[in-house]
């Protein structure tokens, strides 16, 4: 480790100890020498004994900075790793940090634009940031070419070395988790850290975010449900993104929405519809739909429209995942736990040798109490959470796309019920899911599949006669090759049999000559001729083995 890494590691451990986070490690895992070393080296008692453990963990991560804040946010979605009291506190982590100097942001923009002055491309550039987060901050301006209002998102300068340094330390700490926690191996800490690192590095590439926003905008073009601001891709680079500036009401500002006359019931239901449309129709969903990234248009409040920003994190499901997920939801709400268990096995989410009866019983034990509540109060997100937590006991592999979907669904549910507490998610989603499943099977699906593959078959049908001829010719050639190999094998067997026969004769002659030479020396040269004959026959047999 470098001196800088040692200093940073010391600060991290010191921060954890000052918040009493060594309580997370069972005492039996801390040997006496380790406890003495911990006291002697740091001499750092818990200074926040009056706070709950989850609160102390949240405050410690906030003190450690942006990389750790985002790590905590990601861990809050993995409720299989922590009890609810800790996961709920981690969910409160806010990705808000002090802005960096606007002059540095201006330099970043000029560097991204080929070292040309900002004034050459933008008017009214505001050096004071509109918003600031751990990875980037946003400035406002107008495009010089058309006068449109835009926001310019700029990556923080020198953020990459900070991220790499902290990630190295997080990896080091993750390697210790299996040694310190009884359940450490099941938690797969290295896998969790790798997943986080990929997400974090993806957020550093604003070209990727721009492409995601363009895709999402295309998917909801002319839709009354969701508006995605236009991205000006000619001005984008890995460290800078320029997009249309929008004006809307923050989705969690319920008072402002009501004052604007917004139809709150329709708005809440549309949030659910937007989510399921992204997942099942488009196979491409916004993976960071927390309230800070969602606004509501001021226009037509009786036909409200969402505005979505910050597409740095997106998810997608393949066709099989979508079908199994939809059928899982429907089977669960029909209380068909056997079907839920079978779907987990069929999808490959759990090993194929899983005992379906035991799995069904475990799902029923965990999920049946949920139905004690009215259907309108049941949380889709917690349904998924309970299913996944149960499945992990049966060695379900971590499915990153499903973890991200579950996190997003929890956001959507939270926002929806904040807007309209009586929101019945199942009533809103069930027709959509049933319609989607019906569309995937039967005659309509067959017709659609034929249409999708028609160009392929139109190209291949003229080639069929030639393919048939080539197949027949290759079949004939293959049969000839097989016959030839069989004939050669038969010849080889015959030769081997003859060789063994000749070896036997040669050995007999040589043995006989030896006995005659010993017992009848008066026979003269006869034993010698027998020996020579035996050697000759043996050599002929040896030659036939080649």
From Swiss-Prot:
Residue sites binding ATP per the record: 130-138, 153
Functional pathway: Cofactor biosynthesis; ubiquinone biosynthesis [regulation]
Residue numbers annotated as active site: 288
EC number: 2.7.-.-
Chief location category: membrane
GO molecular function, one term: protein kinase activity
GO biological process: regulation of ubiquinone biosynthetic process; ubiquinone biosynthetic process
Pfam families according to UniProt: ABC1 (PF03109)
GO CC terms in record: plasma membrane
Keyword Cell membrane: yes
Membrane topology listed for this record: Multi-pass membrane protein
Keywords (A to Z) from UniProt: ATP-binding, Cell inner membrane, Cell membrane, Kinase, Membrane, Nucleotide-binding, Transferase, Transmembrane, Transmembrane helix, Ubiquinone biosynthesis
Domain Protein kinase: 124-502
Enzyme class: transferase
Subcellular location: Cell inner membrane
Record-annotated membrane-spanning stretches: 501-518, 523-542
Family (UniProt): Belongs to the ABC1 family. UbiB subfamily.
Function: Is probably a protein kinase regulator of UbiI activity which is involved in aerobic coenzyme Q (ubiquinone) biosynthesis.
Stored PANTHER family: CHAPERONE-ACTIVITY OF BC1 COMPLEX CABC1 -RELATED (PTHR10566), PROTEIN ACTIVITY OF BC1 COMPLEX KINASE 7, CHLOROPLASTIC (PTHR10566:SF113)
Protein name: Probable protein kinase UbiB
Organism of derivation: Cronobacter sakazakii (strain ATCC BAA-894)
Gene: ubiB
